[in-house]
Every structure is written in structure tokens, then in C-alpha cells.
Amino acid sequence: MVVSADPLSSERAEMNILEINQELRSQLAESNQQFRDLKEKFLITQATAYSLANQLKKYKCEEYKDIIDSVLRDELQSMEKLAEKLRQAEELRQYKALVHSQAKELTQLREKLREGRDASRWLNKHLKTLLTPDDPDKSQGQDLREQLAEGHRLAEHLVHKLSPENDEDEDEDEDDKDEEVEKVQESPAPREVQKTEEKEVPQDSLEECAVTCSNSHNPSNSNQPHRSTKITFKEHEVDSALVVESEHPHDEEEEALNIPPENQNDHEEEEGKAPVPPRHHDKSNSYRHREVSFLALDEQKVCSAQDVARDYSNPKWDETSLGFLEKQSDLEEVKGQETVAPRLSRGPLRVDKHEIPQESLDGCCLTPSILPDLTPSYHPYWSTLYSFEDKQVSLALVDKIKKDQEEIEDQSPPCPRLSQELPEVKEQEVPEDSVNEVYLTPSVHHDVSDCHQPYSSTLSSLEDQLACSALDVASPTEAACPQGTWSGDLSHHQSEVQVSQAQLEPSTLVPSCLRLQLDQGFHCGNGLAQRGLSSTTCSFSANADSGNQWPFQELVLEPSLGMKNPPQLEDDALEGSASNTQGRQVTGRIRASLVLILKTIRRRLPFSKWRLAFRFAGPHAESAEIPNTAGRTQRMAG
């Protein structure tokens, strides 16, 4: 007997199965959630255990050593697993990138194959039409050639599409085209730059030419001479050379001055090599005479030189350099002779034009003044000698005296005379009894006569680490020179100068219009007394207004006292002359003019302040003693 299933029971069974599935799914979800929670707790616990194990290991707990090792071991294993996972993830990332690139290449290859199929299909069709001609006339001739050309083109296109280097070639072709375009665009620019440079070069050259022309020619209409100075310092020796150059728009020749006094042997070698100009040489009226005043220093001594040469009739300016370097032994030999033959040394000196040394020069600003109460019939010849110590730099500044002079027919052979204007004189009054120290200020005589004007010159030479500078002043006389011997005798003595505080100040400048005209040939009649130059002595003589002669006064330079208002140099000239004396009657006269023009607009030459003091021994003193640096004394007659 067969029992049939009840449909209600079957429905109940299906409902039970569905409920069971739902319950199981809910339980599975709960289990997954619990697993995740437990996993989180495990990770937290593992981290806590790892930290505790590290602390225990730090405190060296032997009891929990096994636990610590196990925990740390587990931690190391977990770290290794994590590192491995990271490495695998990185590799998967790389592989994924590689797969993408390969997939891209496959896509491109599929595209090429499709194009290749199309090209091959067109080629096949073309060949079929070519091989199965309908008209034999058309198969030959122009139509055949066109079909063959078309087939050749299709075959090339197919090969080009199927070649794997197609993309690379296309890229290269595009790059080449881009480069060509860039070159075409950039090519005009360099040409334009070259053209502009070619245009600029002549302009620069023209500017340079203009600069050189402006430097070589005198910009002013007054024909003011240029000056150039160069100061060289070598070890403990200082050579200071002031070279004044007078330029003309047509200047062609220039000679500079060089004074390197190192020792006597060097001077003798220079004398043997360099030509020495003659002592007595009559120069034509077309040339101005030249004068150079040198201050020679030997071993830690300062040498100051001033040179000038100017020619008014010739467009070329001749510049000569004369050097006077003399030792004490030579001076003693020269004193007994009738004429003084100072040594001459010549040497080139590189002089940079339009340059004024702005560094501090330890020098002196010495301004001569004529002794007060001088009679108009007699003016003394006097010169000063400066000695410097402690490696100080000295500069000889010469006061300008202009003179108007006519030739005297009754006396010895005439010589070219240099007539110049003489500025007015402002003399200082010096009390005889109360004043022991006075400031020397520049002063010049009032009137100028046509009679002979004597000059004096001093060549200063130093020894035992002394530096000297010579100050030469020419005093004109207002009356005719007396016939016979001179009433005043010129003796030689030496004054000591010590420089302890010589500083330059830009406010102190050399007095304007400084010129020196020096004539060593003392010619004043038949009974002219012969006077020998000495590089270490200087003398002073003067006549008072009452007719009595003043005694020789001693000139002392006090370095500790500074001149409050030193003179200033402007756009004028410093002229001087250096000449040689002859025998008893001077037959020739060498005149030289030293021109020093300093333009205050462009440059200034600073000098230190000096204070000059006179020590008067009294109006009726027979003689005065002046000690020199070595402790020796010399007497000068009153």
C-alpha cells in the first residue's frame, strides 16, 4: 500500500529549511564579528606583551626569560611575515604595471595586424585585377605602369605597417622635424646678436679712442700742465717722486724720473751707465731750463724728487730727470774746491698720469719766509735742511719767486735770463727779545728790480738713517749789485729735524702759485766770493732796516708742534731750477723751472702740519752752534 505525502508537511519542511538557513547565516555573521573582535584583541595583547617583554629584558628579569624570548620570537616572526607581505605587495604592484604595459603593446599589435590585413586585402585585390586584364591594349602602356606603381605603394604600406620599428621611426621622424623647426627658429637670433655685436664693437673702440684722446690732450684752454705722481715703497725704503709734466696737444716724447737710492755702489754704477749732463752748458733761448730737487735716502730714508721740463718754442716737450745723490765724504771733498759737482743719477721711472696717491704720506708742509727787516739792497741766500727719522716721508716744497731780470752788459759773458713776474711780499715782524718760536708763512718780496738776482740751492744728503729735503729760495734784490766782495759771508751748517708725528690731512694743501728759480752761479761783480754748495749745511743772513746785519739764525723744526693753518695748493705751478756753479767768475747760467700744477677739482695732495720755530741768538752774536744728529757741532759766522 502506497502512502502519499501530505502537501502540508512538505510546505512545513520547506519553511523549516528556510528558517534554518537564516539562523545559520545570522550565526555566521555573529561568528565573523567575534572573530574580528578577537583578532583585534589579540593584536592589542600581542603588542602589550611585546612591550612588557622589552621592559623585562631591560630590567634583566631571569625568571621571565623564557616568556620574554617566546614573545620576542613571536614578534620577530610576525615582523618577518609583515615584511614578506609588503615585499610581495610591491612585487605584485610591479607585475601589475608590467602587465598593463604588455596589454597596451598587445593592443597596438592587434591594431597593426588589423591594418596589415586591410593592406594585404587591397594588395591582393590589386594583383588580381592586374593579372586578369580584360583588354590586352590596356594591359600594356600607361595603365599598366600606373597599376604597378599602385601595387608597389600598397606593398610598401603593408611592410611599413607590419614592421615592429614603425612606431620608433615615426617618433624619430617627429623628433627630427621638431629639431629642424627649432633650429630654423633659433638661427636668426644668433645672426642678429652677431650683427648687434659687430655694431657695438666699433662704438666701444670709438669710445676708447675718445678717452685716450681726451687723456693725451689738455682739455683746458689755459694749457695747464698735467701732473703725475708715483710713490713706491720697497722694504724699509720709501722713494717719493713728484714729476710734473707739461703737455701739449702734439706731445710725442715723455721721460720720467726714477730715484732708487739703495747704496753708494748702486749710485756709482748708475753714474757709469747713465749719461751725465755737463755741468756748464749754455742752452739756447728756445728752451726753458730745468730744475730738479732731490732728497736722497740710503737705507730707511725717503727720497723726494721733483722734475719738470717745458719747451715753449718747440711743440715737443723735452723732459729730463736729474738726480743729486751725494755722500758725506764727497761733500767734505767738494767743500775745498771752487765748484760743486753734485753727483747725477738718471733712471726711468714709470709715472701714471692723472694719478695722485691718496694714501697717507708722512711729509711736511714747509713754507719759507724771508727774514724780517731786510734792506732793499741786500737779500740773503738761505736754504734749509730737513732730517727725518723713523722711516718718515718728507717732501720738499719750494716757494715761488717770479723775477723780471735784464742782462747786464758790463759783467761777465751774458747768459739767457728768465724774466718772470714777482708777486708782492708780506713779511712777518718778529720781535727780537720776546719771540723765540715763530711760524713760517709763505712771503715774497714787494718790488722787483732789473739787477742781478742771486739764488741759492741746497742739496740734502742723509746718513745714519736720516731723511732730508732741500728747500731752495731765491731772493731778488731791489738795487744794483755792489762791485767787489759781498758784505755777508755764506757759511754752512746743519740743522736737525726730527719727525715724530707726521700725518696727512686732506685739508692741508701746498700754497698756490709756488715757483722756484734757482741759480747757483753767484755772479755779482768782479769781487764775487765763491760759494760752495754743501748738502748738509744751510745759512741765513739778513740786513736790518737800520743798516746793521742780523746774525745768522738757527732754523729748528719742531715735529711735536703742528701748523694750525697749513697752506693750500691750487691750480698754480711750482717752478724751480737747479744749476751748477763755475769758477771765480760764472760764465754760464743754467736756469730751470719746476712747475707743479695740482688741480684741486680732480685731486688733492695732502701734507702734514709742521711748525717751524726760529731760535734767535741775538743781534750782535758772533756765532751760533747747531748740533747735528751725530752730536757734532758746526759754527756759522754772523
From Swiss-Prot:
Top-level taxonomic group = Eukaryota
* The gene coding this protein: NBPF4
Point to the regions of Low complexity compositional bias.
214-226
Its localization reads: Cytoplasm
Give the chief site where it resides.
cytoplasm
Name the UniProt record assigns to this protein: NBPF family member NBPF4
To which protein family does this belong?
Belongs to the NBPF family.
What tissues harbor this protein? Expressed in testis.
Which ranges are annotated Basic and acidic residues under compositional bias?
Answer: 192-202, 232-251, 264-273
Which residue intervals make up region (Disordered)?
157-285, 562-584
Q: Where is the composition biased (Acidic residues)?
A: 165-179
What InterPro entries does the database record attribute to this sequence?
A: NBPF, Olduvai_dom
Q: What else is known?
A: Encoded by one of the numerous copies of NBPF genes clustered in the p36, p12 and q21 region of the chromosome 1.
